[in-house]
Amino acid sequence: GFNLNSSYYQSENVDLVEQADVNYRHNGLDMFAMFRYDKMEFRERTNVHQTLISKKQLDLENQLKYNDNKQWLRGNIGMNYMFDENNSIGIKYSIQGSPRYDSKLYTTSKVSLDGKVFDRLQNFTSSETDNELNHQLNAYYTGRVGNLEIDFNADYYQSGYLQEDITGEESEEQEDRDVHAASDVANNLAAAKLVLSYPVWKGKFSVGGEWTYTHRKDNYLNVENYVPSSNSKMNEMNITAFAEYSRSISIGDFILGARYEQIKFDYYKDDLHIDDQSRSYDNIYPNVSFNTRIGKVKTQISYTVKTQRPSYRLLSNSSLYIDRFSIQQGNPTLKSEITHNLNWIASWKFLQLSLGYQQTKNAIIYWGEPLNPNEYTILLKSINLNKSLPMLNAFISASPHIGIWESRLSLGITKQWLTIDS
């Protein structure tokens, strides 16, 4: 089969998505390929007020205009083969590249010290990014040998880019600046997962393991040294083992499980291993759920613990020079968030009610602090909270059918308790 899809989006600008798919099937063989072109523009207007209390109180009032232009080429090719109704294998190779990726940032800043105007700045930053081809390879096998179910998949991912930033800064009270910066980033990830399931005591028992290895190289250079240059490297090994048992009983269905996770993180700066920022730790996370029916009401209660890894962007060692009073930076030492979730859901006809409580450890937040103790420069970056972040949410939704119409209404509230001493 063959399929062509073209999408046109009109707002302040024009966005385009063009995609072609081809597919061939014969007996148990399924072969496929895809090619896609994306043209996207992004515009943002933001007003930001920042206050830094040091020897004096620094107030920054920024007006930012950001324009982003991207063109992406994506493609994949692969095959699936079904030996019989219980056993199949597959492989897919994906590639992605960007012939054009540039952005422009215009910033107008008013700077005050102890309530008196200290300076006014006009900044223009032009960024050009040369993206390397991103490669991803995935292979899987799902099958059954007797009563034993097997699910295996493996992935490899590679990406990288070279970005050059040029900033021109005009000051009413101080010298003007030209800032030249470059970032060279390379990412590699390999992962594999195996799950084995077998019927036990009228239920199903599953065991498995997962392995993930991540390598990242991140070099940043500022020619004028307004922002410190840096060369860093990160290696992370994650090994997970898990087990789960599920069964239906007279009063409902339940699932009991646990996951063991071992993480080893090594951080290098200028090819030297940094012991204080490297770490390894072990954790065990349980999960349990139970669902049943009480009359016409379906209900479920569950408890899970999940980890959320910080993105490559947050882990970046690169810096963004906004102006001489504001610098944005990544944080390569961010830890994964660990969230404990307790949820209850009930549904009756077209009504659904849900209550949830979350407790997040190492929550990632956006943070500002002095770049140096005696300087009036704000360093903006993501950090891990040193205390747990509790959150409660409650939602009710209705989706009744009225004639030919299906209406949906949702009401909810989310409440968090967090106090930060500054």
Protein language model regions, located:
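Extended amphipathic alpha-helical scaffold segments
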Residues: D165, K264-D266, G412-I413
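Flexible, surface-exposed loop regions and adjacent strand-edge segments
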Residues: V48-K56, Y106-K116, T167-E175, N222-P228, ...
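Outer membrane beta-barrel strand-and-loop segments of large Gram-negative receptors
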Residues: L189-K193, S230, M234, N238-T240, ...
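Extracellular loop and loop/strand-boundary signature of outer-membrane beta-barrel proteins
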Residues: N5-S7, L58-K65, R120-S127, Q174-A182, ...
